Design a protein with these regions (language model features):
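Hydrophobic/aromatic ligand-binding patch that stacks against planar heteroaromatic rings
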Residues: 55, 103, 130
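Short glycine-/polar-rich loops that comprise or flank the Walker A/P-loop
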Residues: 81-83, 107-109, 134-137, 152-155, ...
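Short, structured patches in soluble enzyme cores that scaffold and shape functional sites
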Residues: 115-117, 140-143, 161
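Glycine-rich, charge-decorated loop segments at or immediately adjacent to ligand/cofactor-binding or catalytic sites
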Residues: 71-75, 145-160
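Conserved P-loop NTPase nucleotide-binding/switch module
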Residues: 121-145
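Conserved small/polar residues in nucleotide/adenosyl-binding loops
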Residues: 171-172
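Long, charge-dense
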Residues: 62-119, 124-127
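Detector for small/aliphatic-rich hydrophobic stretches
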Residues: 1-63, 77, 82
Length: 172
């Protein structure tokens, strides 16, 4: 869809109005890195991103270094056909980062999710610059322990498990 379908230009609604109120521009920015700092993997981060991913009607979604492959039947049930998913795994960090940059630069996907622990600030800056020029959703999912590490990401959110779902706070 065009700018009409996705609300404010350069922003995709999160699907959660209370979260949109907290997010700059009223949704997930498609102009730069969004860093999600997770207390642990599998606490509901994919459920959080699902409404935004569902809005990418027909576009591919790149998943780099996912900690585990999501259930394909579960994806299909949530309106995300597995054939739209691009799984990328690499053993060397340099290859992971290169792949992420290529995805951002070639514009063939609507979203990129990168799971990564320690990354040099310079490498994150390169990704951020590529993401700024991409008009794609670009989430980097890292351990909460990285909250104190320098990051060029304009938006850094800390995600912790909560009895009612997720506790989301800004990480600085």
């Amino acid at each position: 869809g065009g700018a009409m379908a996705s609300g404010c230009a350069g922003v995709t609604p999160s699907g959660y109005p209370p979260l949109d109120e907290l997010l700059p521009g009223g949704g997930w920015s498609r102009r730069g890195l969004i860093e999600l700092l997770l207390q642990q993997n599998g606490i509901g981060e994919m459920r959080l991103l699902l409404p935004a991913l569902q809005r990418l009607a027909g576009q591919r979604i790149a998943l780099l270094q996912p900690p585990h492959l999501p259930q394909l039947s579960g994806l299909r049930a949530r309106g995300l056909p597995p054939e739209r998913m691009l799984w990328i795994r690499a053993s060397r960090l340099s290859d992971v980062l290169w792949s992420a940059e290529q995805v951002l630069r070639n514009g063939s996907c609507g979203a990129l999710l990168l799971w990564q622990g320690a990354v040099r600030t310079e490498a994150l800056r390169r990704l951020h610059m590529a993401a700024q020029a991409s008009d794609m959703l670009c989430w980097v999912l890292r351990p909460l322990a990285m909250a104190d590490a320098p990051s060029p990401a304009p938006l850094r959110l800390a995600l912790r498990p909560h009895p009612e779902g997720l506790q989301i706070g800004r990480a600085h």
